[in-house]
Amino acid sequence: MAHARDYHRSNVRELFPIVVDAYRRLADRYDVVVLEGAGSPAEINLRASDIVNMRMAQAADAACLLVGDIDRGGVFAALLGTLALLRPHERARIRGFAINKFRGDLSLLTPGIAAMQRRLGLPSLGVVPWLNDIGLDEEDSVALDDAPRIAAGAWHAAQTDRSRALRVAVVALPYLANATDFAALAAEPSVDLAYAEAPADLERADVVILPGTKDTLGALRWLDGGMGDAVIAFAQRKPVIGICGGYQILGLTVADPHGVEAGGARSGLGLLPVRTVLTREKVTRAVRVYPRRFALFGREPHVSDEIQGTGYEIHMGQTTANSRLSAFADVVRGGVERVVDGAVSANGLIVGTYVHGLFADDPIRWAFVRAARARSGLHAPAQLAAYSAQREARFDRLAAHVRAQLDLQPLLAAAAGAAATRLPRRRSLPTRRRSLR
Protein backbone atom coordinates (compact mmCIF):
# COMPACT_ATOMS: atom_id res chain seq x y z
CA MET A 1 0.00 0.00 0.00
CA ALA A 2 1.36 3.43 -0.94
CA HIS A 3 2.09 5.91 1.86
CA ALA A 4 1.88 9.71 1.84
CA ARG A 5 5.69 9.97 2.04
CA ASP A 6 6.09 7.79 -1.07
CA TYR A 7 3.50 9.85 -2.91
CA HIS A 8 5.29 13.12 -2.15
CA ARG A 9 8.65 11.66 -3.17
CA SER A 10 7.24 10.63 -6.53
CA ASN A 11 5.74 14.06 -7.22
CA VAL A 12 8.82 15.75 -8.67
CA ARG A 13 10.40 12.66 -10.20
CA GLU A 14 7.35 11.15 -11.91
CA LEU A 15 4.47 13.61 -11.92
CA PHE A 16 6.08 16.99 -12.49
CA PRO A 17 7.30 16.23 -16.04
CA ILE A 18 3.73 15.22 -16.91
CA VAL A 19 2.41 18.51 -15.50
CA VAL A 20 4.96 20.51 -17.47
CA ASP A 21 4.09 18.66 -20.67
CA ALA A 22 0.41 19.44 -20.10
CA TYR A 23 1.27 23.11 -19.60
CA ARG A 24 3.29 23.22 -22.80
CA ARG A 25 0.41 21.76 -24.77
CA LEU A 26 -1.86 24.48 -23.41
CA ALA A 27 0.75 27.18 -24.07
CA ASP A 28 0.87 26.14 -27.70
CA ARG A 29 -2.87 26.67 -28.03
CA TYR A 30 -3.63 29.74 -25.91
CA ASP A 31 -2.24 33.24 -25.52
CA VAL A 32 -2.73 33.26 -21.73
CA VAL A 33 -2.57 30.28 -19.38
CA VAL A 34 -3.77 30.66 -15.78
CA LEU A 35 -2.03 28.42 -13.22
CA GLU A 36 -4.11 27.80 -10.10
CA GLY A 37 -2.07 26.83 -7.09
CA ALA A 38 -3.21 24.61 -4.23
CA GLY A 39 -3.03 25.48 -0.56
CA SER A 40 -0.21 27.82 0.40
CA PRO A 41 2.80 28.46 -1.86
CA ALA A 42 4.98 28.63 1.25
CA GLU A 43 4.52 25.23 2.91
CA ILE A 44 8.20 24.87 3.71
CA ASN A 45 7.81 21.31 5.02
CA LEU A 46 6.48 20.21 1.61
CA ARG A 47 8.60 22.48 -0.58
CA ALA A 48 10.80 19.68 -1.91
CA SER A 49 7.79 17.82 -3.33
CA ASP A 50 5.37 20.66 -4.15
CA ILE A 51 4.66 20.69 -7.88
CA VAL A 52 1.59 22.93 -8.07
CA ASN A 53 2.77 26.25 -6.67
CA MET A 54 6.11 28.03 -7.05
CA ARG A 55 7.88 25.13 -8.77
CA MET A 56 5.30 25.28 -11.57
CA ALA A 57 5.45 29.08 -11.61
CA GLN A 58 9.21 28.80 -12.13
CA ALA A 59 8.80 26.26 -14.94
CA ALA A 60 6.31 28.51 -16.74
CA ASP A 61 8.14 31.75 -15.88
CA ALA A 62 4.80 33.00 -14.57
CA ALA A 63 3.85 36.35 -13.13
CA CYS A 64 2.11 35.63 -9.81
CA LEU A 65 -0.72 37.18 -7.81
CA LEU A 66 -0.81 36.45 -4.08
CA VAL A 67 -4.42 36.22 -2.84
CA GLY A 68 -5.48 36.25 0.80
CA ASP A 69 -8.82 34.98 2.11
CA ILE A 70 -10.00 37.56 4.65
CA ASP A 71 -13.05 35.48 5.57
CA ARG A 72 -10.75 33.11 7.46
CA GLY A 73 -9.27 35.98 9.48
CA GLY A 74 -5.65 37.11 9.85
CA VAL A 75 -5.28 38.00 6.19
CA PHE A 76 -2.46 40.53 6.64
CA ALA A 77 -0.40 38.11 8.73
CA ALA A 78 -1.01 35.40 6.12
CA LEU A 79 0.15 37.62 3.27
CA LEU A 80 3.22 38.87 5.13
CA GLY A 81 4.13 35.41 6.42
CA THR A 82 3.82 33.87 2.98
CA LEU A 83 6.14 36.45 1.42
CA ALA A 84 8.62 35.99 4.26
CA LEU A 85 8.78 32.22 3.72
CA LEU A 86 9.19 32.36 -0.04
CA ARG A 87 12.73 32.19 -1.37
CA PRO A 88 14.09 35.38 -3.02
CA HIS A 89 13.65 34.14 -6.60
CA GLU A 90 10.08 33.08 -5.74
CA ARG A 91 9.23 36.44 -4.15
CA ALA A 92 10.48 38.15 -7.32
CA ARG A 93 7.63 36.52 -9.23
CA ILE A 94 4.91 38.14 -7.10
CA ARG A 95 3.47 41.12 -8.98
CA GLY A 96 1.01 42.18 -6.32
CA PHE A 97 -1.49 41.00 -3.75
CA ALA A 98 -5.28 40.95 -3.50
CA ILE A 99 -7.80 40.27 -0.77
CA ASN A 100 -10.77 37.98 -1.39
CA LYS A 101 -14.17 37.50 0.30
CA PHE A 102 -14.33 40.86 2.07
CA ARG A 103 -17.51 41.80 3.95
CA GLY A 104 -18.13 45.18 5.48
CA ASP A 105 -16.92 48.75 5.15
CA LEU A 106 -13.95 48.90 2.77
CA SER A 107 -12.72 52.13 4.36
CA LEU A 108 -11.87 50.15 7.50
CA LEU A 109 -9.53 47.98 5.45
CA THR A 110 -7.76 50.80 3.63
CA PRO A 111 -5.15 51.63 6.34
CA GLY A 112 -4.09 47.98 6.52
CA ILE A 113 -3.72 47.75 2.76
CA ALA A 114 -1.60 50.90 2.68
CA ALA A 115 0.64 49.54 5.44
CA MET A 116 1.02 46.24 3.59
CA GLN A 117 2.01 47.99 0.38
CA ARG A 118 4.74 49.88 2.21
CA ARG A 119 5.97 46.83 4.07
CA LEU A 120 5.90 44.40 1.15
CA GLY A 121 6.93 46.80 -1.57
CA LEU A 122 4.10 45.40 -3.69
CA PRO A 123 0.92 47.01 -4.98
CA SER A 124 -2.55 45.98 -3.95
CA LEU A 125 -4.43 44.86 -7.06
CA GLY A 126 -7.77 45.13 -5.32
CA VAL A 127 -10.28 43.77 -2.84
CA VAL A 128 -13.00 41.37 -3.98
CA PRO A 129 -16.17 41.70 -1.89
CA TRP A 130 -18.11 38.65 -0.78
CA LEU A 131 -20.53 37.50 -3.49
CA ASN A 132 -23.73 35.91 -2.22
CA ASP A 133 -25.44 32.96 -3.93
CA ILE A 134 -22.57 32.31 -6.28
CA GLY A 135 -23.99 28.89 -7.14
CA LEU A 136 -20.84 27.37 -8.66
CA ASP A 137 -19.14 24.02 -8.12
CA GLU A 138 -16.79 23.70 -5.17
CA GLU A 139 -14.09 21.20 -4.32
CA ASP A 140 -15.34 17.91 -2.89
CA SER A 141 -14.27 18.56 0.70
CA VAL A 142 -15.73 22.07 0.66
CA ALA A 143 -18.98 21.01 -1.00
CA LEU A 144 -19.59 18.24 1.54
CA ASP A 145 -19.01 20.45 4.57
CA ASP A 146 -22.25 22.34 3.94
CA ALA A 147 -24.21 19.60 2.17
CA PRO A 148 -27.64 18.75 3.65
CA ARG A 149 -27.75 15.61 5.79
CA ILE A 150 -30.89 13.50 6.01
CA ALA A 151 -30.21 12.82 9.68
CA ALA A 152 -30.44 16.56 10.32
CA GLY A 153 -34.19 16.35 9.74
CA ALA A 154 -34.52 16.84 6.00
CA TRP A 155 -37.13 14.11 5.50
CA HIS A 156 -38.39 13.25 8.97
CA ALA A 157 -41.91 14.49 8.25
CA ALA A 158 -44.09 12.18 6.16
CA GLN A 159 -44.97 13.67 2.79
CA THR A 160 -47.89 12.23 0.81
CA ASP A 161 -48.42 15.10 -1.61
CA ARG A 162 -47.82 13.79 -5.13
CA SER A 163 -46.46 17.21 -6.09
CA ARG A 164 -43.73 17.06 -3.43
CA ALA A 165 -40.04 17.04 -4.25
CA LEU A 166 -38.32 13.85 -5.36
CA ARG A 167 -36.14 12.71 -2.45
CA VAL A 168 -32.66 11.67 -3.63
CA ALA A 169 -30.27 10.17 -1.07
CA VAL A 170 -26.55 10.21 -1.89
CA VAL A 171 -24.74 7.70 0.31
CA ALA A 172 -21.93 9.52 2.13
CA LEU A 173 -19.20 7.00 1.33
CA PRO A 174 -15.74 7.40 2.91
CA TYR A 175 -13.39 9.39 0.67
CA LEU A 176 -16.32 10.45 -1.49
CA ALA A 177 -15.15 11.96 -4.77
CA ASN A 178 -16.68 14.15 -7.48
CA ALA A 179 -19.45 15.58 -5.32
CA THR A 180 -20.03 18.07 -8.14
CA ASP A 181 -21.81 15.23 -9.96
CA PHE A 182 -24.92 16.20 -8.00
CA ALA A 183 -24.89 19.99 -8.19
CA ALA A 184 -27.19 20.14 -11.21
CA LEU A 185 -29.56 17.58 -9.74
CA ALA A 186 -29.75 19.48 -6.45
CA ALA A 187 -30.60 22.64 -8.42
CA GLU A 188 -33.79 21.11 -9.84
CA PRO A 189 -36.89 22.70 -8.22
CA SER A 190 -38.62 19.31 -8.03
CA VAL A 191 -35.70 17.51 -6.35
CA ASP A 192 -34.63 17.41 -2.69
CA LEU A 193 -31.11 15.95 -2.52
CA ALA A 194 -29.36 15.12 0.73
CA TYR A 195 -26.58 12.87 2.02
CA ALA A 196 -27.28 9.62 3.88
CA GLU A 197 -24.92 8.61 6.67
CA ALA A 198 -26.96 5.87 8.40
CA PRO A 199 -29.21 3.03 7.16
CA ALA A 200 -32.33 4.69 8.57
CA ASP A 201 -31.68 7.69 6.33
CA LEU A 202 -32.83 5.68 3.30
CA GLU A 203 -36.31 4.94 4.66
CA ARG A 204 -38.03 7.96 3.13
CA ALA A 205 -35.86 8.29 0.01
CA ASP A 206 -37.20 7.79 -3.51
CA VAL A 207 -33.81 7.23 -5.18
CA VAL A 208 -30.40 6.22 -3.79
CA ILE A 209 -27.12 7.17 -5.46
CA LEU A 210 -23.79 5.53 -4.67
CA PRO A 211 -21.21 8.19 -5.65
CA GLY A 212 -17.60 7.93 -6.66
CA THR A 213 -14.98 7.24 -4.00
CA LYS A 214 -11.20 7.33 -3.88
CA ASP A 215 -11.21 4.06 -1.90
CA THR A 216 -13.68 1.49 -3.25
CA LEU A 217 -12.50 -1.35 -0.99
CA GLY A 218 -12.59 0.93 2.04
CA ALA A 219 -16.11 2.02 1.10
CA LEU A 220 -17.18 -1.63 0.90
CA ARG A 221 -15.81 -2.22 4.41
CA TRP A 222 -17.79 0.79 5.63
CA LEU A 223 -20.95 -0.49 3.93
CA ASP A 224 -20.60 -3.74 5.92
CA GLY A 225 -21.65 -1.71 8.96
CA GLY A 226 -25.29 -1.82 7.88
CA MET A 227 -25.60 0.68 5.06
CA GLY A 228 -24.88 -2.01 2.46
CA ASP A 229 -27.81 -4.15 3.61
CA ALA A 230 -30.01 -1.04 3.61
CA VAL A 231 -29.08 -0.28 -0.01
CA ILE A 232 -29.75 -3.90 -1.05
CA ALA A 233 -33.19 -3.82 0.60
CA PHE A 234 -33.95 -0.44 -0.96
CA ALA A 235 -33.03 -1.73 -4.43
CA GLN A 236 -35.72 -4.41 -4.30
CA ARG A 237 -38.39 -1.78 -4.88
CA LYS A 238 -36.78 1.56 -5.71
CA PRO A 239 -34.08 2.94 -8.06
CA VAL A 240 -30.38 2.82 -7.22
CA ILE A 241 -27.66 4.49 -9.30
CA GLY A 242 -23.92 3.86 -8.98
CA ILE A 243 -21.36 6.25 -10.47
CA CYS A 244 -17.72 5.21 -10.97
CA GLY A 245 -16.70 3.68 -7.61
CA GLY A 246 -20.39 3.42 -6.80
CA TYR A 247 -20.86 1.37 -9.97
CA GLN A 248 -18.04 -0.95 -8.88
CA ILE A 249 -19.69 -1.36 -5.47
CA LEU A 250 -22.98 -2.45 -7.08
CA GLY A 251 -21.23 -5.45 -8.65
CA LEU A 252 -20.36 -8.95 -7.47
CA THR A 253 -16.67 -8.45 -6.61
CA VAL A 254 -13.93 -5.83 -6.54
CA ALA A 255 -10.39 -7.23 -6.73
CA ASP A 256 -7.14 -5.34 -6.19
CA PRO A 257 -4.35 -7.71 -7.30
CA HIS A 258 -1.79 -4.90 -7.78
CA GLY A 259 -2.30 -3.19 -4.41
CA VAL A 260 -3.67 -0.02 -5.98
CA GLU A 261 -5.70 0.54 -2.80
CA ALA A 262 -5.25 -1.97 0.04
CA GLY A 263 -4.89 -5.15 -1.99
CA GLY A 264 -7.05 -8.24 -1.81
CA ALA A 265 -10.67 -8.52 -2.89
CA ARG A 266 -14.13 -7.95 -1.46
CA SER A 267 -17.65 -8.87 -2.39
CA GLY A 268 -19.81 -6.07 -3.75
CA LEU A 269 -23.50 -5.55 -3.09
CA GLY A 270 -24.41 -8.00 -5.84
CA LEU A 271 -27.05 -5.76 -7.41
CA LEU A 272 -25.45 -5.95 -10.87
CA PRO A 273 -23.73 -9.06 -12.33
CA VAL A 274 -20.43 -7.28 -12.99
CA ARG A 275 -16.90 -7.81 -11.66
CA THR A 276 -14.18 -5.18 -11.25
CA VAL A 277 -10.40 -5.51 -11.19
CA LEU A 278 -8.52 -2.41 -10.04
CA THR A 279 -5.64 -1.56 -12.37
CA ARG A 280 -2.48 0.51 -12.12
CA GLU A 281 -3.42 2.61 -15.13
CA LYS A 282 -5.81 5.47 -14.44
CA VAL A 283 -8.39 6.26 -17.11
CA THR A 284 -8.92 10.02 -17.51
CA ARG A 285 -10.94 10.96 -20.57
CA ALA A 286 -13.58 13.43 -21.67
CA VAL A 287 -16.38 11.50 -23.34
CA ARG A 288 -19.60 11.90 -25.27
CA VAL A 289 -22.42 9.73 -23.96
CA TYR A 290 -25.26 8.11 -25.89
CA PRO A 291 -27.57 6.32 -23.42
CA ARG A 292 -29.11 3.11 -24.73
CA ARG A 293 -32.86 3.01 -25.29
CA PHE A 294 -34.48 1.41 -22.25
CA ALA A 295 -37.27 2.01 -19.75
CA LEU A 296 -35.38 3.97 -17.08
CA PHE A 297 -36.33 2.64 -13.64
CA GLY A 298 -38.80 0.30 -15.34
CA ARG A 299 -41.29 3.07 -16.01
CA GLU A 300 -42.14 5.49 -18.76
CA PRO A 301 -40.82 7.71 -20.16
CA HIS A 302 -38.15 5.71 -21.95
CA VAL A 303 -34.66 7.04 -22.49
CA SER A 304 -34.79 7.91 -26.17
CA ASP A 305 -32.17 7.46 -28.86
CA GLU A 306 -32.05 11.23 -29.29
CA ILE A 307 -30.74 11.95 -25.80
CA GLN A 308 -27.00 12.44 -25.55
CA GLY A 309 -24.58 14.31 -23.35
CA THR A 310 -21.00 14.84 -22.27
CA GLY A 311 -19.03 13.79 -19.24
CA TYR A 312 -15.70 12.40 -18.16
CA GLU A 313 -14.15 9.18 -16.91
CA ILE A 314 -11.60 9.15 -14.10
CA HIS A 315 -11.10 5.72 -12.58
CA MET A 316 -8.63 2.93 -11.90
CA GLY A 317 -10.40 -0.29 -12.77
CA GLN A 318 -11.85 -2.48 -15.48
CA THR A 319 -15.38 -3.78 -15.05
CA THR A 320 -16.67 -6.76 -17.00
CA ALA A 321 -20.35 -7.61 -17.25
CA ASN A 322 -22.43 -10.68 -17.89
CA SER A 323 -22.93 -10.91 -21.66
CA ARG A 324 -26.71 -10.87 -21.24
CA LEU A 325 -26.67 -7.67 -19.19
CA SER A 326 -27.87 -4.47 -20.85
CA ALA A 327 -25.34 -1.66 -21.10
CA PHE A 328 -26.20 1.82 -19.91
CA ALA A 329 -24.68 3.77 -22.78
CA ASP A 330 -22.34 3.93 -25.72
CA VAL A 331 -19.42 6.23 -24.99
CA VAL A 332 -17.15 7.95 -27.49
CA ARG A 333 -13.66 8.77 -26.21
CA GLY A 334 -11.56 11.37 -27.96
CA GLY A 335 -14.08 11.66 -30.74
CA VAL A 336 -13.09 8.30 -32.25
CA GLU A 337 -13.01 5.35 -29.83
CA ARG A 338 -16.51 3.97 -29.20
CA VAL A 339 -16.95 1.71 -26.15
CA VAL A 340 -19.80 0.32 -24.08
CA ASP A 341 -20.32 1.84 -20.62
CA GLY A 342 -22.11 0.72 -17.52
CA ALA A 343 -24.94 -1.68 -16.89
CA VAL A 344 -28.70 -1.71 -16.27
CA SER A 345 -30.56 -4.42 -14.36
CA ALA A 346 -33.30 -6.41 -16.10
CA ASN A 347 -36.03 -4.47 -14.28
CA GLY A 348 -34.41 -1.10 -15.04
CA LEU A 349 -34.13 -0.16 -11.36
CA ILE A 350 -30.36 -0.50 -10.97
CA VAL A 351 -28.07 1.62 -13.14
CA GLY A 352 -24.28 1.76 -13.07
CA THR A 353 -21.94 3.98 -15.08
CA TYR A 354 -18.32 5.15 -15.08
CA VAL A 355 -19.26 8.57 -16.48
CA HIS A 356 -19.10 11.60 -14.21
CA GLY A 357 -20.96 14.83 -14.97
CA LEU A 358 -24.01 13.19 -16.56
CA PHE A 359 -26.54 15.22 -14.60
CA ALA A 360 -25.02 18.49 -15.84
CA ASP A 361 -26.55 17.76 -19.26
CA ASP A 362 -30.13 19.02 -19.23
CA PRO A 363 -31.75 16.30 -21.42
CA ILE A 364 -30.21 13.42 -19.43
CA ARG A 365 -31.07 15.00 -16.08
CA TRP A 366 -34.61 15.79 -17.17
CA ALA A 367 -35.14 12.19 -18.31
CA PHE A 368 -33.89 11.00 -14.92
CA VAL A 369 -36.15 13.35 -12.95
CA ARG A 370 -39.24 12.50 -14.99
CA ALA A 371 -38.67 8.75 -14.77
CA ALA A 372 -37.82 8.80 -11.06
CA ARG A 373 -40.88 10.87 -10.21
CA ALA A 374 -43.09 8.53 -12.26
CA ARG A 375 -41.60 5.51 -10.49
CA SER A 376 -42.28 7.14 -7.11
CA GLY A 377 -45.91 7.90 -7.96
CA LEU A 378 -45.29 11.64 -8.11
CA HIS A 379 -46.62 14.16 -10.58
CA ALA A 380 -44.43 15.18 -13.51
CA PRO A 381 -42.20 18.15 -12.58
CA ALA A 382 -43.94 21.49 -12.96
CA GLN A 383 -40.61 23.11 -13.83
CA LEU A 384 -37.20 21.89 -15.00
CA ALA A 385 -33.99 23.87 -14.53
CA ALA A 386 -31.96 25.00 -17.55
CA TYR A 387 -28.80 24.28 -15.59
CA SER A 388 -26.31 24.59 -18.44
CA ALA A 389 -27.42 28.12 -19.32
CA GLN A 390 -27.73 29.10 -15.66
CA ARG A 391 -24.20 27.86 -14.96
CA GLU A 392 -22.74 29.96 -17.77
CA ALA A 393 -24.63 32.98 -16.47
CA ARG A 394 -23.15 32.41 -13.00
CA PHE A 395 -19.64 32.28 -14.42
CA ASP A 396 -20.30 35.52 -16.30
CA ARG A 397 -21.60 37.12 -13.09
CA LEU A 398 -18.50 36.06 -11.16
CA ALA A 399 -16.17 37.25 -13.93
CA ALA A 400 -17.86 40.65 -14.03
CA HIS A 401 -17.67 40.90 -10.23
CA VAL A 402 -13.93 40.15 -10.14
CA ARG A 403 -13.15 42.32 -13.16
CA ALA A 404 -14.85 45.30 -11.51
CA GLN A 405 -12.76 44.99 -8.34
CA LEU A 406 -9.27 43.96 -9.48
CA ASP A 407 -6.66 45.77 -11.51
CA LEU A 408 -5.35 42.87 -13.58
CA GLN A 409 -3.43 45.06 -16.02
CA PRO A 410 -0.02 44.36 -14.45
CA LEU A 411 -0.55 40.61 -14.71
CA LEU A 412 -1.98 40.76 -18.20
CA ALA A 413 0.84 43.02 -19.33
CA ALA A 414 3.40 40.58 -17.96
CA ALA A 415 1.61 37.67 -19.61
CA ALA A 416 1.55 39.48 -22.92
CA GLY A 417 5.25 40.25 -22.68
CA ALA A 418 4.63 43.99 -22.50
CA ALA A 419 5.99 46.37 -19.93
CA ALA A 420 3.68 46.90 -16.97
CA THR A 421 2.99 50.55 -16.30
CA ARG A 422 3.48 50.44 -12.55
CA LEU A 423 5.62 47.33 -12.13
CA PRO A 424 9.15 46.27 -13.10
CA ARG A 425 9.66 45.03 -16.64
CA ARG A 426 10.00 41.26 -16.80
CA ARG A 427 12.72 39.51 -18.75
CA SER A 428 11.86 37.94 -22.11
CA LEU A 429 10.85 34.33 -22.34
CA PRO A 430 12.42 31.85 -24.74
CA THR A 431 8.90 30.62 -25.51
CA ARG A 432 6.17 32.64 -27.18
CA ARG A 433 3.58 32.32 -24.42
CA ARG A 434 3.17 33.93 -21.03
CA SER A 435 1.52 32.57 -17.93
CA LEU A 436 -0.26 33.86 -14.90
CA ARG A 437 -0.56 32.25 -11.52
Model-derived features: positions:
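Conserved AMP-binding/adenylate-forming
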Residues: 290-293
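Gly/Ala-rich beta-loop-alpha elbow adjacent to hydrolase catalytic centers
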Residues: 242, 246
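Class I SAM-dependent methyltransferase SAM-binding "motif I" and its flanking Rossmann-like core
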Residues: 254-282, 286-288
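Conserved catalytic-site region of short-chain dehydrogenase/reductase
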Residues: 249
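Flexible phosphate-sensing "switch/lid" loops adjacent to ATP/NTP-binding sites
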Residues: 1-233, 239, 256, 280-283, ...
